[in-house]
């Protein structure tokens, strides 16, 4: 009987390969259908479908499978890869980029068939683009889940942080009590030193205490697991890009040249997925590759086409960009570097 690790590995690999191959086949079939309307025969349709199948087969045999085998067999090489994920690189470059390109090509083919953009449908089908993003998110979740067992319980991120912080505070208070009880002279000698130090830090005001439940029902409802949070965090992280690609299906966008910047900036935003979740550069790259470009793109869309993109999204991009610049760089300047003494 196969062990749990082998079953987990096989299931994960099958899901990743499906997420790697299916979006390209679906987008290319849509392109073949749009191209068939210009010709009465189905030769071109099956030719395009055959080329898409051949592309997926060649890329899988020459790139996907060899890279997967090397990563599985040569663990010492895998440990040398720091800060980025090869599997996501293959998905973004070999699946997402061709899919976005042929999504634009589908629109251009339909324009050529009808002679103008006015005869196009009111909205583009949402399934192909949603399938591309869903496949990327699924691969991202699988890569994060590999380090966790699928059975048993795992604490959430915030629970671990709370435990670590509490232990550090208890250790610090205990050390101070032991030092003052064991050697009063040293404690008195340490007072001038403490007073002579500049007041560069103040006690951090603790937030409201979290409740602890005695009821079994409430305790059950308050359960948190890091593996379940992975799904939530992964989908929330790319919600802004999903909304931007939804705008691309609006008739005022895909019937005009605005379709190109929307797809280009959305793809640039998705490039962040190739980095590891704890990469120190991820926050700054999120500003440079998503929030800051989306500010100008959303503002331009609103000024040119009206509120086809939510104003809330624009406010989110502006506030995230300003807060990142202020708290990471402006607060280091001399006028803003003084510590606050008021807890409110």
From Swiss-Prot:
- Predominantly, its location class is membrane
Q: Where in the cell is it found?
A: Membrane
Question: Where does this protein have coiled-coil stretches?
Answer: none
UniProt KW keywords: Glycoprotein, Membrane, Transmembrane, Transmembrane helix
The entry annotates sugar attachment on 114
Q: State the family named in the UniProt similarity comment for this chain.
A: Belongs to the TMEM236 family.
Designated gene of the protein: Tmem236
Ranges annotated as spanning the membrane: 9-29, 47-67, 86-106, 122-142, 257-277, 294-314
Output a single Gene Ontology CC term carried by this record: membrane
State the annotated membrane topology for this chain: Multi-pass membrane protein
| Keyword check for Glycoprotein | yes
Please identify the protein, giving its name as recorded. Answer: Transmembrane protein 236
